[in-house]
């Protein structure tokens, strides 16, 4: 069943970061917008050739804005719990659950899986999490989470460089992180 327009608009109210202390709430809509901005900047910094094709530009924008839209029905499932679900139910259990919640969303994800678009949006999603928590995280737990997010981004860059050598991943991520003042020698 597809999400209705009214359900999609609830992204303005779905909250993120509910297991990390933050100075202010972030909504799914704010996160999705920031991911779209970062994904566009990242694609340009990587010199992604898809930017020369209107249909791929549109797909990048659409997926950036909707990559987490299922959360208007599920809420923002914390990443640590996603890992527990995978341990309990096996690899792909979270995707199977999302398919039950909204098969159209799951179908959209299957269409971009393994593409440059998926890679760019995943990197943008990770960068956005670091960006938000760097500015809004409070306390020792938030610092540990932020350190973990940076480690994950570094590993993602290393892995993606191997699997997608045509993308200038490290250069692109460095440029975007520098531009939005995410600091660290972890890349």
Which sequence ranges carry the predicted segments?
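Short alpha-helical hairpin
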Residues: 1-19
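Histidine/acidic-rich helix-loop-helix segments that form or flank divalent-metal centers
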Residues: 58-62, 102-144
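Acidic, Mg2+-coordinating active-site segments of isoprenoid diphosphate-utilizing enzymes
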Residues: 68-100
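Alpha-helical phosphate/pyrophosphate-handling elements in metalloenzyme active cores
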Residues: 23-60
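Charged phosphate-binding loop/patch that engages nucleotide di/tri-phosphates or the phosphate backbone
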Residues: 159-187
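Active-site alpha-helical segments that house and flank conserved acidic catalytic motifs
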Residues: 37-43, 58-77, 122
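Active-site metal-coordination segments of metallo-dependent hydrolases
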Residues: 22-32, 82-94, 118
